[in-house]
């Protein structure tokens, strides 16, 4: 809940239902992320929906970014899984927090999740590029392989990076955007004070 100082009433978050349902005027009829997700300056949040089986368990949806991070790559974990709280909020555990504390917060899978996140494979690195590229909910992604752009070591382990393209699709099945792994480099001309 949030305290509204003008009305002097505590107001509960409604989860931005008009946005999530696609009835927000800005949405064009397509589901959008909540305002708090869209306003996240750290580009560390992703909101989405998953397909469910009749018994309420997650249906396999291999190319849904949430399903991939939670059930395939297993880098996104529930916070305090022993409580079984709802709704399902999943987090990629931070790698700089002491592991004993992370094990308490995320359970026994945290060590493998942190290792996988620190040394991402080709697909995980591509899926991580989807974060905060759009305020619309991503329902599916596609990976188009590109050339190798880096080969070396990362924290003492061999690492290869490819300039793959990841394509995001919305609820209507249409392409929302595409982005590459390797970010372009721009050099400002000397006429600007802060040029290099």
Model-assigned labels for residue ranges:
Residues 1-34, 38, 50-53, 57:
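Ferredoxin-like iron-sulfur electron-transfer modules
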